[in-house]
Every structure is written in structure tokens, then in C-alpha cells.
């Protein structure tokens, strides 16, 4: 055999061997992770560098094993995916933004000039001073994304939040910008941010799967596969045979938006056969609670006597047949409750009405959904439905993986509520191997500039402003119970939510993006025109106007007020021209001409950056020390160290924002402006930088910022929110030693309080233990799991109980429906143009189309097709498959618009209407707060048609 690279020459062979060995040598190795929203992420890496350049990374299996004394589960290691494995190449890719850039030509023309940081800061500061002086600070809009979300030095909810806090601008709530709110769980439990550990999936006997976790949860899905080895059944519910369906024991190919019929048919079988947990539903749910027959509202004490409590509800005492007040401060039952029954009551005006239990109404509702009708509506055969009921029969443990799509589908709330019905009826809440999940993060953000920078002066003047801010949250919760609500029976979570809600109102810096879209981005007319819902009693505009008029968004409605006039847009860690439905259609055409200033901070050239006035290079993940947000799903907080210096002239997001703040304050002072009004606040110009630097304690140098990380984690450890992996003191040195820390205990940030359970390092974790074990109430109107929604809007729409509703027509009456999901080769648009990822697929956007349909329309594999509806159109490559429905087109999200012909992505034909009911307010848990309860754009099942395109590429 011939010798490779040198034939028979020994010296040549030695040179090749030496070169190969030299390739695997490095100068330094550091801990690393990737601060993107690949939730839950938490993937630890070792990063290898040589000659000032990162040469590779590999998964570090340093997450301690689960050693729960009661529940055995596989450990987390290894955690990682192909996106993380190639970042060492992507950070040197052609799309990397390395220098401050200023637009020369028209926006989006591609004409740029390189400028210095001083010029960028001075020009942006002068323009911001103009805007503050002429239009007010609330005309500055901050769009925070999730990429680059370093807790203390990164973008998005990290340092990015400080820009709104200090200048008085308006930050758009990122959870509704990206559409990851889960309305069905929120309506049922009063919260959606409960996040059991991913190891909890392994303990389930039946796993109900929405979405496509094989693509979206690469690091976690092994728990589902391992659960099958112990006999668990996996049920995939999706209209197409997704990649996740091949690993399921049962695939239910449901018709469009027909999931509520499936769940109600399942509930019917469970109830008729007595396969429900009677004690659980009596104690934990509203099923025994009485509802007035005349108006469909809960029976309240205020109905029965003058001055009665409007939040005191009733059940029927099974022993006496009389009314019994439902306890507020505990779930402990004061008597045995009647589940199915009717009682006549005398109202305060002397009239008599009948009241009926919610369970009675539920039985009537589910009776409509016979197996035959479910088959007709949903396409699920009666035999499958019966088998599913057997797999959900108590005492089997059921876990519901909802993914993130319910918040992106018009009737996704009904779909999700239906699944929650099944969980509650069978008692599958608050126990190991049961429940559902949302997403949760944020314990570390209480050490960030958005929170600490808003603290009272005495805290910022102290020696430990971060520790002072963290300790303040607990005091504020107790104060909210007494001073604000005057209700000592209030659950801790409700107090935490109230504290955050009222606190953020006082800053005037947060708004639901729906108000921005509706009042300023052109969607008011688009939504009313391109949404046709035969079951909706009103147009979207009617819901918006009533909600605003009723003051349901008071304190967050600055963008709905007369005179509101956005003039500047800052984008940190986001990409709104890609992410917003209709982004390259209505959004850019309407918003861009209104803006005097558009600034994007990003490590790469995104579509939004290419349409900005200034593109500022943010440092990448391996270039400075910080951590990624932690979450209860893994309880592991990853640390990323500086493996190499920041590339080019890039800076941390915190350094960029401080440069902008410093230049803006200098310009304001030059003009003699000492203070200005920002909503409810008065901004002292002299104090802007003082607050941003926590009382001038942390400057902008790398050493200063590392000291900030050090002090923040020391403080987080001292309050017990995080613990080190080795039991030693938590600080930067410990993070550098171990690569991370444990999220633990009960952090008082509301998204953490929502777990309703202690987080113990190394133990299996599940949520709602407080409710099941300690009888702590839920944070709903009745303080129980709510099957019934008695808000007038939901009663009017006949959604007080779950029901099937046909999907609306979005975009027209075309014969096909468009669906989407998370792309396998990127995290949102991060890495979507990375060379290594492009090698793993066709290298450009493509859409899955049914092979038979394509053949009938003369479309071959890889042809360009034109996809269109009444709102817009785009072109994309066709990828033929038998795995999608004949009336379906599947295109995964996150391709950059500039990867499509004419820069028009699939979002260009998505009018993205919101569901008007989600503007409901005025009740205990129908109140907006950060990340919770607001409409998001709905895009799943948009109406489309296709044809072969003449475009050749």
C-alpha cells in the first residue's frame, strides 16, 4: 500500500505526524457555554485556544450526578449539540461583525462605513438627546432578544435592560415578542413558569408530546427515550409525522386545531369509567365550585349579601347539602364536597337562582365529544382514543410536554387547557413524573443593571448594592401582602408577582409588544382585515380598545397613549425583522420610516443590523467572563470564561450601553438639561451613570466587569439562591474552578417562586409540591386549578370551558395551511448562516411539501415554489416528503430573510394576529406582568397556496 503524504519517505511521514499532533495542542483551556435561548440549554463545554484563537470545544461532563435517595434517574451528562460544537468556527465566520459601522446609503442598501467607537457613541448620544428633548424618553424603544443573554455583561435581559431603566425608554417584553408564553397553562394554573427538571420526564409512565423535541431539545430528549426502556409510553400529537413521531409508541395525526376535541373525548372516557382522582379534584381544582346558571359566573358572597366579598366562592357540603365557603388561605378541605350537583340560592335582592358545580358543567360539555365525533373532528380513531385513555388511567404518572407552540397558535390556549384537564382529572400535578412545563429564568437578573440600577439611593450607596437589592425582594413581597393587597392569606407567588407588577409600573419602562404592533407598527388594520374567525364575537380592535379604556394595562400602556411617538429603536440580542410576523412586510414598511435612529448591538450581521443606522459589534460567548441564565429544568448555571480576547473592536453589551449612556448624559448636560420626566419618574441626568455603575462601583474595564461578576455571585451565594458545586464559597474563582454552580433553594424572583418547591442540588425536581403536600393555594381567581374561566369575555366567546373551535382563516381562504417549528441547525437565527451548519442541509431555506401534491402541481424536489395568500408571498425551495399532510406546508423558522430570494422570508405572508381574549383583565390572574399574560402573534395554520415559481436562483 502506498504511504500517504510522502510515500516511503520516513522524514515526510514524521512531518505529517508532527503536524497532526501539533493540531491537537493548545495554550489554554477554559470553561464555556453558549448564551443563546436554546432553552433550557445549560450545556457545559471546555474551550481550547492556541495563539490567541479558539481552535475547538468539547462537551464537559461536569454536571454532578442525580443522587436522589428516592428516585433513580440518568444523569445530565453529556449535554450539548452540533450548534455548540461548531461555535469555534462560527465566531470566525464571514458574518461576524467586528467594528462599529455607520450606514452611508439608504437603510438596507448595504452601504456602510467603518467608524470609531467615539464617533459612534457621540453621534448616537447626540441623536438620543435630540429625541429626549423633542419627543420624550418614552419614544426610545428597546427590543430585547434572547441571543447573547449574558446575565451581567451580555445583551437582551442582561445589560440590555439597563438602557431602558436608566434613560427612561420603553422595553418591549421579549416573551411576547418571541411568542413563548403558554396561555393555556397560565389560565389553568395562574402561572406558566413551572419547570420540573428534565429528569422528571424519565419518571413518567405516559409522556404526551407536543412540538418536535427531537429537533428542539437535543440535549434533553434522551430522558424520553430512556423512559421507554422502563416501560413508559410516548404519545406524539402532531398533524405531520414529525421527526419526533418516529420515537413514539403512538402517533395521533390530529387535524388543524382539533386538539381540544381529542382532550375532551379523552376526558369523557376517563370520567365515564371513573378513571379519575376524585380526592385530588375535590381538593385541588375548581370542579366542586358553584356557578350561577343565570349568568354563568361563579357564585360569590357579594351575590348573597351587601358588602360581601367578590372573591369568596362556594361549594356544597356533601354531609349537609348546604353552601360552604371555599377557604382562601389553604387547599385543605373544610368538608367533603359535592362534585356533581345543583343547589338553589337566594340572592341579596331576594331572587332565587340555581347554582351548579363546575364538574356538572364539565360532564355536560364532554358528553358532546363521543369517540365518533372526535374521529370526525380530529381524525383520531376510537380505538386510539380508548388506548390513550388506558395509558392515562390512574395511578399512571402523566407528563405533558407542551413545547412552545401553543402561544403561537390562535386556539393554542384551548389545546393546552384541554391537556391540563387530563392532568388535573387524573391527579397528575405536584408529584414525581407528572405535570407540565413552561419556561423559567431570571434569578441572576436580580443582580443585573435593570434591577439593581433601579434601587433606592441608600442601597446603591452601600458597600454591597447587589446584596442589598437581592435582600430587598423578600421584604417587598411581604409588603405587597399587607400594604398593597391587605390579604395575609395571599400565596407567596401572588405576592411576588404583585411586587414585580407594581414595581415595574413605577419605572414606566415595560410594555407588552402587542400595543407597539397595534398602535405604531401598522397591525391594527392588518389584523382586522386578515383574520376571519367565525367564532369570535368581536374584532381584535374591539378587545384592544376596551382593555385600554378599562385601565387593565395601566402603568404599561404608555405606547397606547395619545402623543406616543416612537423615534428610536435599540435592538440588543434580537432580530425583529426576522422574528416579527410580517417583519419584512408590514413591520419594516410602517415602523422604519417613523424612526430617526436605529441601533443594533450584535456579534453578527443579522437582517435587522443590515437595515439599521448603526451596527455595533458585541463580543461573542468565549470572549469575556459571564454566565448564562439558569433555569429549574436543570438547576445548573453555566459559567463562560474569557478564552480569547474580544475579536476586532467588539465590546461587551454592558460596555456598549455604558458608552451610549455616557455620551447621552454629556450631551444633555451640554444643553443645560439637568432632569427630565419619563412616565412616572423624574430622571436626574447626573445620576444616570451613577445608577448604571451601581453607585460608581463598577466601571467598564474588563477587570471592573469581572469584579462585578465576582461580587454578584458572591451575593447570590450568600442569599442561598446559588450554591457552589464543591461546597466552597461561591465567587468568580469558584466558577473558574468548577465551571458552574447550582440554582438552589427558593429565589424570590417570581419566575423562580413559581416552582412552588425547593430546588435541592442533585435531587430530582418537580413543581407544585407546595400545593399537593402543604396545601398552598394556586394563584388563580378561585385559588384552585381552574377548569372554568368566568371572565365575561370568555363566557361571551363560549370558552369558559374548553371546546373545539374550527381554526380561523388567517391570510385568506387558501386551501393549505402553513406550520413551523424550531430549526435543527440554528438557535433562532444564531448560527443559521454558519458555514458548518450550512453543510448539514441544503445550505438554504427549504419547505416540506407532500410528494403527491407536488407531483400533481408539476413541482420537483428542489424546485423553487411561490407560497402566497392574501397578505403576502415568498419563494423557497421545495423538499418533497410523504410525512406531511396534503394540505400542509412545513417550513422551520429562523432562516435569515437575506437567505431567501428578494429578501422576503416566510414571515412575509404571516399577518400574525393576536387572540383578542388575551387582552382580558381586571381579575386576579388576568393581569399583565413581565413575561406573563399578554397577547402574542399567532402564525400556526396560516392559510396559503403554492405554485411552481419561475425563479431559477
Q: How should these model regions be labeled?
A:
Residues 248-254, 622-623, 636-647:
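Short beta-alpha connecting loops at secondary-structure transitions
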Residues 143-151, 373-380, 403-411, 442-443, ...:
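Conserved short loop/turn motifs at secondary-structure junctions
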Residues 243, 607-640:
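Flexible glycine/proline-rich, aromatic-decorated loop/lid segments
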Residues 155-235, 338-346, 358-364, 376, ...:
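Extended redox/cofactor-interaction regions of prokaryotic respiratory oxidoreductases
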Residues 1-341, 372, 458-505, 512, ...:
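N-terminal export/assembly segments and adjacent metallocofactor-ligating motifs
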Residues 94-119, 123, 268, 273-382, ...:
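N-terminal leader/propeptide and maturation segments of large enzyme subunits in energy/redox metabolism
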Residues 2-13, 653-711, 715-725, 829, ...:
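Long, contiguous, secondary-structure-rich segments that constitute the structural scaffold
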Residues 120-141, 197-204, 364-366, 386-399, ...:
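Glycine-rich phosphate/diphosphate-binding loops that line cofactor/substrate pockets in enzymes
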Amino acid at each position: 500500500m502506498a504511504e500517504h503524504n510522502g510515500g516511503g519517505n520516513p522524514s515526510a511521514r514524521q512531518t505529517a505526524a508532527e503536524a497532526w499532533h501539533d493540531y491537537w495542542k493548545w495554550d489554554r483551556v477554559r470553561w464555556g457555554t453558549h448564551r443563546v435561548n436554546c432553552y433550557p440549554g445549560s450545556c457545559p463545554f471546555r474551550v481550547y485556544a492556541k495563539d490567541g484563537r479558539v481552535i475547538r470545544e468539547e462537551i464537559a461532563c461536569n454536571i454532578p450526578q442525580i443522587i436522589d435517595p428516592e428516585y433513580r434517574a440518568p444523569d445530565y451528562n453529556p449535554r450539548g449539540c452540533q450548534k455548540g460544537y461548531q461555535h469555534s468556527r462560527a465566531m470566525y465566520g464571514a458574518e461576524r461583525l467586528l467594528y462599529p459601522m455607520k450606514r452611508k446609503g439608504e437603510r438596507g442598501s448595504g452601504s456602510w462605513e467603518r467608524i470609531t467607537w467615539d464617533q459612534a457613541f457621540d453621534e448616537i448620544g447626540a441623536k438620543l438627546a435630540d429625541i429626549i428633548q423633542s419627543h420624550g424618553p418614552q419614544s426610545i424603544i428597546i427590543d430585547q432578544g434572547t441571543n447573547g443573554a449574558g446575565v451581567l455583561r451580555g445583551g437582551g435581559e442582561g445589560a440590555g435592560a439597563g438602557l431602558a431603566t436608566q434613560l427612561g425608554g420603553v422595553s418591549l417584553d421579549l416573551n411576547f415578542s418571541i411568542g413563548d408564553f403558554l396561555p393555556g397553562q397560565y389560565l389553568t394554573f395562574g402561572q406558566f413558569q413551572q419547570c420540573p427538571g428534565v429528569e422528571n420526564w424519565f419518571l413518567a409512565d405516559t409522556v404526551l408530546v407536543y412540538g418536535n423535541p427531537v429537533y428542539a431539545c437535543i440535549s434533553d430528549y434522551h430522558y424520553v427515550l430512556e423512559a421507554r426502556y422502563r416501560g413508559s409510553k410516548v404519545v406524539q400529537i402532531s398533524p405531520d409525522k414529525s421527526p419526533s413521531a418516529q420515537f413514539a409508541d403512538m402517533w395521533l395525526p390530529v387535524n388543524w386545531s382539533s386538539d381540544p376535541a381529542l382532550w375532551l373525548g379523552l376526558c369523557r372516557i376517563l370520567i365515564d369509567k371513573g378513571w379519575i382522582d376524585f380526592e385530588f379534584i375535590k381538593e385541588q381544582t375548581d370542579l366542586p365550585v358553584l356557578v350561577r346558571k343565570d349568568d354563568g359566573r361563579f357564585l360569590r358572597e357579594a351575590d348573597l349579601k351587601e358588602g360581601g366579598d367578590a372573591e369568596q366562592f362556594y361549594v356544597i357540603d356533601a354531609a349537609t347539602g348546604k353552601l360552604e365557603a371555599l377557604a382562601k388561605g389553604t387547599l385543605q378541605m373544610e368538608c367533603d364536597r359535592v362534585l356533581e350537583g345543583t343547589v338553589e340560592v337566594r340572592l341579596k335582592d331576594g331572587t332565587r337562582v340555581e347554582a351548579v358545580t363546575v364538574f356538572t358543567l364539565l360532564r355536560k360539555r364532554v358528553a358532546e365529544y363521543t369517540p365518533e365525533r372526535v374521529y370526525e373532528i380530529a381524525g383520531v380513531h376510537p380505538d386510539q382514543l380508548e388506548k390513550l385513555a388506558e395509558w392515562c388511567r390512574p395511578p399512571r404518572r402523566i407528563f405533558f410536554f407542551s413545547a412552545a407552540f401553543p402561544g403561537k397558535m390562535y386556539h393554542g390556549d384551548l389545546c393546552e387547557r384541554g391537556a391540563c384537564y387530563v392532568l388535573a382529572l387524573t391527579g397528575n400535578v405536584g408529584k414525581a413524573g407528572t405535570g407540565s412545563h413552561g419556561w423559567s429564568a431570571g434569578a441572576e437578573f436580580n443582580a443585573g443593571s435593570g434591577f439593581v440600577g433601579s434601587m433606592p439611593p441608600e442601597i446603591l450607596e452601600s458597600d454591597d448594592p447587589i446584596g442589598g437589592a437581592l435582600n430587598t425582594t423578600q421584604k417587598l413581597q411581604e409588603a405587597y401582602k399587607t400594604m398593597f393587597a391587605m390579604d395575609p392569606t395571599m400565596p407567596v407567588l401572588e405576592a411576588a408577582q404583585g411586587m414585580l407588577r407594581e414595581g415595574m409600573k413605577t419605572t414606566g419602562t415595560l410594555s407588552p409588544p402587542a400595543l407597539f404592533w397595534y398602535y405604531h407598527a401598522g397591525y391594527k388594520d392588518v389584523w382586522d382585515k386578515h383574520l376571519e374567525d367565525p367564532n369570535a364575537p368581536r374584532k381584535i380592535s374591539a378587545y384592544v380598545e376596551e382593555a385600554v379604556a378599562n385601565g387593565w394595562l395601566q402603568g404599561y400602556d404608555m405606547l397606547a397613549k395619545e402623543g406616543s411617538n416612537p423615534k428610536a429603536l435599540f435592538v440588543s440580542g434580537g432580530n425583529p425583522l426576522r422574528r416579527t410576523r410580517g417583519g419584512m412586510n408590514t413591520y419594516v414598511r410602517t415602523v422604519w420610516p417613523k424612526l430617526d435612529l436605529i441601533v443594533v448591538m450584535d456579534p453578527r450581521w443579522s437582517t435587522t443590523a443590515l437595515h439599521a443606522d448603526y451596527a455595533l459589534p458585541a463580543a461573542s460567548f468565549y470572549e469575556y467572563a459571564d454566565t448564562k441564565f439558569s433555569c429549574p429544568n436543570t438547576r445548573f448555571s453555566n459559567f463562560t470564561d474569557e478564552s480569547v480576547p474580544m475579536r476586532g473592536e467588539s465590546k461587551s453589551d454592558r460596555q456598549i450601553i455604558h458608552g451610549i449612556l455616557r455620551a447621552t448624559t454629556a450631551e444633555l448636560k451640554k444643553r443645560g438639561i439637568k432632569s427630565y420626566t419619563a412616565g412616572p419618574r423624574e430622571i436626574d441626568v447626573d445620576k444616570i451613570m451613577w445608577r448604571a455603575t451601581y453607585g460608581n462601583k463598577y466601571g467598564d474595564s474588563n477587570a471592573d466587569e469581572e469584579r462585578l461578576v465576582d461580587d454578584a455571585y458572591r451575593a447570590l451565594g450568600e442569599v442561598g439562591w446559588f450554591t457552589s458545586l464543591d461546597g466552597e464559597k461561591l465567587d468568580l474563582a469558584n466558577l473558574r474552578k468548577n465551571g458552574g454552580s447550582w440554582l438552589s433553594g427558593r429565589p424570590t424572583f417570581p419566575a423562580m417562586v413559581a416552582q412552588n418547591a425547593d430546588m435541592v442540588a442533585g435531587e430530582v425536581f418537580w413543581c407544585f409540591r407546595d400545593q399537593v403536600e402543604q396545601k398552598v393555594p394556586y394563584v388563580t381567581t378561585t385559588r384552585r386549578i381552574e377548569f372554568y374561566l368566568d371572565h365575561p369575555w370568555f363566557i361571551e366567546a363560549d370558552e369558559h370551558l374548553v371546546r373545539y373551535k374550527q381554526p380561523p382563516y388567517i391570510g385568506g381562504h387558501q386551501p393549505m395551511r402553513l406550520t413551523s417549528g424550531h430549526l435543527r441547525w440554528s438557535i433562532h437565527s444564531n448560527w443559521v448562516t454558519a458555514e458548518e451548519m450550512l453543510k448539514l442541509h441544503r445550505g438554504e431555506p427549504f419547505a416540506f411539501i407532500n410528494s403527491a401534491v407536488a407531483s400533481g402541481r408539476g413541482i420537483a424536489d428542489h424546485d423553487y415554489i411561490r407560497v402566497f395568500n392574501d397578505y403576502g408571498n415568498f419563494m423557497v425551495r421545495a423538499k418533497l416528503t410523504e410525512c406531511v399532510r396534503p394540505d400542509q406546508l412545513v417550513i422551520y423558522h429562523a432562516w435569515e430573510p437575506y437567505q431567501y430570494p428578494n429578501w422576503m422570508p416566510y414571515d412575509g405572508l404571516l399577518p400574525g394576529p393576536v387572540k383578542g381574549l388575551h387582552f382580558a383583565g381586571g381579575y386576579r390572574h388576568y393581569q399583565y406582568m413581565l413575561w406573563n399574560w399578554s397577547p402574542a402573534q399567532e402564525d400556526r395554520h396560516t392559510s396559503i397556496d403554492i405554485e411552481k415559481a419561475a425563479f431559477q436562483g
